[in-house]
């Protein structure tokens, strides 16, 4: 089902808010400004007996669209004194989290919401997406396509022509043209005066990728190696693989610890181009789920190793891949992801001087 226009979406807004606030529909008064273009205008202002809400609608919950909506509705809320709310067809986890971090309320046309204001706390989640389309849409973050995204994130201070990007990524020029067109449309890249591509907000691009990244697609072999700690296990495995010159790199919480020293970990996640199970056998590696503290991941594309670095004698994927793989769902993953993202932000600042 196609996402509705702003006018159609706003026609549903009073009933949705009335239900969330447990008020009769007659208690809500809405002023629409659907065609608003001013920096401090929102699509609608909804007044209740106790509060006012500035509402901005975006027909997509993609990271770039959500970021623009948040910026717009925060300005409107600051000017009017109203509670800022972002309205989308369906709230994904990334959109909800970004709104929470920005102190902007959010709700969707599917019945989910997260709104915090003086004397008000609303949390509704788990309602299905009314606008889910059949099939899997093509994505600029698909396995091969994401090479272009990775290259831009690894070089945040540089500008590239489409020919440059085709050459370094190994993608054909037509594919690169389509990808850059989508990225330009979503506001994730811009063109400079020389018509080269630049990334205005690398953190926004990184979050957009993570939102689409599916850790569950990776082929994973789980097993157990006796070790006194996750750190000790990481060093044991690294030493064994380095001696055999295998291409490998740790990721997930182990990589986050190497990059940021944030939190201990029990389970080591490791990318390897070929199964290292035989090499790890002398360490006591036993394949199986119960008690698994070792996950061996088969990369879908060897570009996962781009940006890899050696820290304390252990080869780790770079900050970008670490941030993506912290979607593994293991303990402290989200907290570690914030630390890794902060470190990447610092690296961007250094690169841009």
Residue map of PLM features:
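Hydrophobic alpha-helical interaction segments
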Residues: 106, 278-353
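Nucleic-acid nuclease catalytic cores
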Residues: 77-103
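Loop-centered beta-sheet repeat module
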Residues: 148-210
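Acidic-basic catalytic patches of nuclease active cores, encompassing PD-(D/E)XK
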Residues: 1-33
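Short alpha-helical segments that sit at the start of domains
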Residues: 122-147
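Charged, structured surface patches that assemble and position nucleic-acid processing machinery
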Residues: 103-115
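Short gly/ser-rich loop at a beta-strand->alpha-helix junction or flexible surface loop bordering the NTP-binding
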Residues: 216-301
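Conserved catalytic cores of phosphodiester-cleaving nucleases, focusing on short active-site segments
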Residues: 38-78, 84-86, 323
């Amino acid at each position: 089902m196609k996402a509705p226009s702003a006018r159609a979406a706003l026609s549903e807004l009073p009933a949705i808010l009335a239900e969330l606030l447990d008020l009769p529909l007659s208690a809500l008064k809405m002023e629409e400004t659907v065609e608003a273009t001013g920096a401090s205008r929102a699509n609608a202002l909804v007044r209740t007996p106790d509060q006012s809400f500035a509402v901005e609608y975006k027909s997509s919950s993609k990271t770039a669209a959500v970021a623009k909506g948040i910026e717009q509705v925060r300005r409107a809320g600051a000017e009017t004194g109203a509670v800022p709310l972002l309205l989308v067809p369906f709230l994904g986890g990334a959109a909800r989290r970004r709104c929470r971090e920005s102190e902007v309320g959010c709700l969707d046309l599917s019945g989910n919401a997260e709104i915090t204001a003086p004397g008000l706390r609303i949390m509704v989640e788990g309602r299905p997406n009314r606008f889910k389309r059949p099939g899997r849409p093509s994505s600029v973050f698909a396995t091969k396509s994401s090479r272009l995204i990775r290259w831009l994130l690894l070089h945040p201070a540089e500008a590239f022509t489409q020919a440059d990007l085709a050459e370094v990524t190994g993608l054909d020029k037509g594919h690169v043209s389509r990808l850059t067109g989508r990225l330009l449309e979503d506001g994730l890249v811009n063109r400079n005066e020389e018509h080269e591509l630049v990334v205005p907000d690398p953190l926004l691009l990184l979050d957009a990728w993570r939102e689409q990244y599916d850790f569950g697609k990776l082929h994973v072999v789980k097993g157990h190696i006796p070790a006194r700690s996750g750190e000790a296990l990481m060093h044991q495995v690294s030493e064994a693989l380095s001696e055999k010159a295998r291409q490998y790199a740790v990721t997930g919480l182990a990589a986050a610890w190497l990059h940021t020293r944030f939190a201990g970990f029990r389970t080591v996640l490791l990318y390897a181009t070929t199964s290292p199970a035989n090499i790890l056998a002398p360490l006591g590696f036993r394949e199986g789920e119960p008690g698994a503290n070792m996950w061996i991941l088969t990369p879908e594309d060897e570009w996962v190793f781009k940006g890899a670095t050696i820290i304390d004698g252990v080869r780790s994927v770079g900050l970008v891949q670490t941030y993506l793989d912290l979607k593994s769902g293991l303990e402290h993953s989200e907290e570690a992801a914030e630390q890794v993202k902060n470190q990447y932000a610092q690296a961007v600042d250094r690169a841009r001087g």
